[in-house]
Swiss-Prot record:
This is Transcription termination/antitermination protein NusA. It is found in: Cytoplasm. InterPro entries: DNA_repair_Rad51/TF_NusA_a-hlx, KH_dom, KH_dom-like_a/b, KH_dom_NusA-like, KH_sf_prok-type, NA-bd_OB-fold, NusA_bac, NusA_N_sf. One of its GO terms (molecular function) is DNA-binding transcription factor activity. The gene is nusA. GO terms for biological process: DNA-templated transcription termination; transcription antitermination. PANTHER family: TRANSCRIPTION TERMINATION FACTOR NUSA, TRANSCRIPTION TERMINATION_ANTITERMINATION PROTEIN NUSA.
Length: 503
């Protein structure tokens, strides 16, 4: 019985907190490495098998069976052809391993010293694997660590059991300062493997999820799933918004999160360096949710554009600065929380904007439908915004517009349908036409400009070069300076050719 091996396995397993199987594997690998050094060849493959009950061990030299070949073997000290192998055992197949018992090295002081580095490496790998297994399950949770080292770029946290977490400077709340041995909470957002440093536990104190997890601790109703956090947005260290809802009508979700005399929300705020937190009532109606999220500003009116996923919000002029917030903070957080692009303006600006847009729509109706201003205005006042709505709404809805009878409604729908059909045919024809590469690569050219040019039969750089500024402004929306620059860019190769001919 080799008691030395068993004693080393027991002590290292207890000291490192690693299973005995891992230590046995490490010692086997170490003994195999020491045994291999007895051979003159560099790539001899040795396997050592330790009896985990007695500590006795055996050593074997190994060859892998490969296909017969006329060429020399890639690893002659580790491989044997199938023909050679079957001279030893006729049942062997490609991929099998032939083992030959060899004399084992003694597990003495010299062998221990030679094997030490291998054992340490194996144990370190096992510890790293253990850390990854332990913390992979905790991604998305709060963790607590002790500040071990502070640098300009990051803070290293001691998580215990040889585990360390990395808190990068950009994941720290501004103006936050920690000292060695300070305890702090953070949100574990990733576990990754670094070849040099081992497992990297990446934590954050700035992410919205950190705020959410803190509320889960302070508000038991969230853990009990009586209250649900639907979203959060933060300007770390300054301000945050969090949206909550409940399916239990008897509970006030905002009041529960605020707590008695603000105790719950204050506890969260203190952890975040005094971050001001707005608790918003969630609503499945996006417009109502935005109204709630804009608090403390009161929304006077709101216009939703689902196509562009934007909302125009009008507030009283006196509340405009409050609605926007310092450096746009309030509207930015509301936008992040709701997922909508928000445009905040005064009621007068909203009216002016909508009047301008209504004017454009009215002009489009007059041109496309060939109607007078009165009919176009009636369509706009009734809420029709484009030709598709005119063409495809139920005829009863169109007849409900003041001054429209059945004949007028039918004629408007016919005209709108004809225009849309013509546009679709033109679009298909346009798809078949493609701008030349020399047109697309001109300085100042955009995809939208190229599309408009192609619509007007300007397909190449030379087509554009022949246009004047006035010609260009008549076919696309562009100012004088931009038009001149674009035309000069298109003509540049003409001048280059002239210079080349002169020289």
């Amino acid at each position: 019985m080799n008691k030395d091996i068993l004693l080393i396995v027991d002590s290292m397993s207890n000291e490192r907190g690693v299973s005995k199987e891992v230590i046995f594997e490490a010692i086997e690998a170490a003994l195999a490495a020491v045994t291999a050094k007895r051979y003159e060849e560099d790539d001899v493959k040795i396997r050592v098998a330790i009896d985990q009950k007695t500590g006795d061990y055996e050593s074997f030299r190994c060859w892998t069976v490969v296909e017969d070949t006329n060429e020399s073997l890639e690893f002659p000290n580790q491989e044997m052809t199938l023909k050679q192998a079957r001279e030893i055992d006729s049942d062997l197949e490609v991929g099998d391993v032939i083992e030959e018992p060899v004399e084992s090295v003694k597990f003495g002081r010299i062998a221990v010293q030679q094997a030490k580095q291998v054992i340490v490496q194996k144990v370190r790998e096992a510890e790293r694997a253990k850390i990854i297994r332990q913390y992979e399950k905790r991604v998305g949770e709060l963790v607590i660590g002790v500040v071990k080292r502070v640098t300009r770029e990051s803070i290293i946290l001691d998580m215990g059991e040889n585990a360390e977490a990395l808190l990068l400077r950009e994941e720290m709340i501004p103006r936050e300062a920690f000292r060695i041995n300070d305890r702090l909470r953070a949100y574990l957002y990733s576990v990754c493997q670094d070849k040099k440093r081992g497992p990297q536990l990446l934590v954050s104190r700035t992410r919205p999820e950190f705020l959410v997890e803190l509320f889960k601790i302070e508000v038991p109703e969230i853990g009990e799933e009586v209250i649900e956090i639907k979203g959060a947005a933060r300007d770390p260290g300054s301000r945050a918004k969090i949206a909550v809802k409940t399916n239990d009508g008897r509970i006030d979700p905002i009041g529960a999160c605020v707590g008695m005399r603000g105790s719950r929300v204050q506890a969260v705020s203190n952890e975040l360096g005094g971050e001001r937190i707005d608790i918003v009532l969630w609503d499945d109606n996006p417009a109502q949710l935005v109204i709630n999220a804009m608090a403390p500003a009161e929304v006077a009116s709101i216009v939703v554009d689902e196509d562009s996923h934007t909302m125009d919000i009008a507030v009283n002029k006196d509340q405009l600065s409050q609605a926007i917030g310092r450096s746009g903070q309030n509207v930015r957080l509301a936008s992040e929380l709701t997922g909508w692009t928000l445009n905040v303006m005064s009621e007068a600006e909203m009216a002016q904007k909508h009047e301008k847009e209504a004017g454009k729509i009215k002009t489009a109706f007059m041109e496309k439908l060939d109607v007078d201003e009165e009919v176009a205005d009636a369509l706009v006042q009734a809420g029709f915004m484009n030709l598709e709505e005119v063409a495809y709404v139920p005829k009863e809805e169109l007849q409900g517009v003041e001054g429209f009878d059945e004949d007028i409604s039918a004629e408007l729908q016919r005209r709108a349908g004809d225009v849309l059909l013509t546009q679709e045919i033109a679009k298909q024809e346009l798809d078949e036409k493609k701008p030349a590469e020399d047109l697309l690569t001109l300085p100042g050219m955009t995809t939208e400009l190229a599309r408009q040019l192609v619509e007007n039969e300007v397909l190449t750089r030379d087509d554009l070069a022949e246009k004047s500024v006035l010609d260009l402004k008549e076919i696309i929306e562009i100012d004088d300076e931009a038009a001149a620059n674009l035309i000069m860019a298109a003509r540049a190769h003409w001048f280059a050719e002239e210079e080349s001919e002169k020289s």
